[in-house]
């Protein structure tokens, strides 16, 4: 339990009908007594005047007192709900800060105290910020699932399985004279594979949750006049890019943030790729390649009136060779309205081929559906959860150590190495929920929160 008491405005700054001030810490009850002039009954709303030190009324509203541990932070908490004018809120906060032992809260400190007092784990605390920042209904639902503990429960299930497996492995190491060899009888190998499979499923859901939170970066690339800017306009639903018949019209990177059925996409239009003599166009082309290297997916635009080829290696082998293998690619044969080709997805092999007309919009819906599939969109976010980059990194490291442990078990029956890899895996999973976290990590996470949360 902390010894200091903190105060902050819990509602957004600015003018509003209602403004809420939150106080948390051992002095909360004293603050209530000094500001309202009476001892508040726990968990009852009382309509009272809020008084200055000399007894003059600063505002009037509802006061609520929650004694520990039955509060958001796990500490004594006071909430004053008054009028939402910035001057009124400022006067009340100054009044409370004048009481000995009370200080202004840091960003995210209320949520941090809730975490430190075991009222929630780290993923739930992060979900509060994600719920506030949600840019779509689907993102809000996913953040709420995390806040309610769904992500935490999946991680806890994995940790419990790891602990159970570690018992078997440690027993095989410590009692080699036993008749049953736990490492050789297939029990450990089977349980290990089950954990790997479950972790892969969690990683897949977490990837979709991260895309829901951060969005997928899609870069439109190709030669000049392939219709890249027209496709950007078609996807965004507005004239974001200038479209002309002059090659090299787009010389810089253009960005649009859109949602497809609640899934956020960062669509980036780039300069046409070619050997340019113009210095400004050269800079734009280099920037295009920089964006391509950082993309989650590349839409390779092809002018269908210039070639019948559909294989990108045949269309432009140098482009394919330069594209990083980790980046997914979709071939877009544009101007299908002029070539008479059937619109839509033609095959779903790697890479997927889509025929469309960026100018008329025909076939663009097929591309939208394809992009949703690339993001792992299932059409049902009720069971999903929100995830962050640090969660994905921790899950990736956990998977790597499980893989090492499996290789050591299968190749060498190396129980000691397997035991160590399982321990490290468990540590990485515990980082996600905060059971094992450095103070620096906690500071970075909570400092990104709103003040008053």
Swiss-Prot record:
Broad EC category: hydrolase
Predominant localisation class: cytoplasm
Positions with a binding annotation for Mg(2+): 229, 250
EC annotation from Swiss-Prot or TrEMBL: 3.6.-.-
CC cofactor note: Binds 1 potassium ion per subunit.
Keyword Transmembrane: no
Binding site for GTP: 225-230, 244-250, 269-272, 334-337
One term of GO molecular function: metal ion binding
Keywords, in A-Z order: Cytoplasm, GTP-binding, Hydrolase, Magnesium, Metal-binding, Nucleotide-binding, Potassium, tRNA processing
Chain ranges of the TrmE-type G domain: 215-376
Record flagged with keyword Glycosyltransferase: no
GO cellular component entries: cytosol
An example Gene Ontology biological process: tRNA wobble uridine modification
SUPFAM superfamilies per UniProt: P-loop containing nucleoside triphosphate hydrolases, TrmE connector domain
Required cofactor(s): K(+)
Subcellular location: Cytoplasm
Binding site for (6S)-5-formyl-5,6,7,8-tetrahydrofolate: 22, 79, 119, 453
Family membership noted in the UniProt record: Belongs to the TRAFAC class TrmE-Era-EngA-EngB-Septin-like GTPase superfamily. TrmE GTPase family.
Subunit structure: Homodimer. Heterotetramer of two MnmE and two MnmG subunits.
UniProt cross-references to NCBIfam families, sorted A to Z: mnmE_trmE_thdF (TIGR00450), PRK05291.1-3 (NF003661), small_GTP (TIGR00231)
Name used for this protein in its record: tRNA modification GTPase MnmE
Source organism: Vibrio parahaemolyticus serotype O3:K6 (strain RIMD 2210633)
